[in-house]
């Protein structure tokens, strides 16, 4: 889950 690190990316 990239959103967990980037938030939107």
Curated annotation (Swiss-Prot):
The modification Arginine amide is found at residue 9. GO terms for biological process: neuropeptide signaling pathway. Coiled coil: none annotated. The keyword Secreted applies. The keyword Ubl conjugation does not apply. One of its GO terms (cellular component) is extracellular region. Keywords: Amidation, Neuropeptide, Secreted. Expressed in the CNS and midgut but not in the ring gland, thoracic perisympathetic organs (tPSO) and abdominal perisympathetic organs (aPSO) (at protein level). It is found in: Secreted. Myoactive peptide. This is Tachykinin-related peptide TPTAFYGVR-amide.
